[in-house]
Amino acid sequence: FARAPYRMLLGPDARISGVHGRGCVCFSPEPFVTVRGRSISTFPMKGTASSATQEARRWLETDEKENRESATIVDLMRNDLSMVATGVKVKRYRYISPVETSKGSILQCSSEISGLLPENWRSRLGEILLKLLPAGSVTGAPKEATCRAIAEAEDMERGFYTGIFG
């Protein structure tokens, strides 16, 4: 059991780092954003099912709640990317991929949203991240109202909680 956390760190999506004297560990396969050249993309993951059942894929494709949640978050993330990029569009909507976990394979429903950053994006990276954070796939929608509700309900800052990494 003591080696279980170490084994998890060997996975392809594990990250570990020290930030401001604290250790942070991340196991999420969902990237907040990726940037290649000037292209910025986000891949919100909404909808998970065990791949052990024959019906899992069809359920992910047809479940009304899963479809509505994906539509809401994809629209939110598309709007967020539009604050920092041009030509933002949904490239792939609700594609299903297997994800390997320590407890076996699951099916994950994701979407891909991309746009073009300005030429000077590197000199504005902090500003860009501040406009995009917190990640809409974590907060849900409406993002601003959710953040206000959390701030009112909690007595302390969350610090490094369900954020981005890497």
What do these predicted regions represent?
Residues 1-166:
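Extended alpha-helical targeting/anchoring segments
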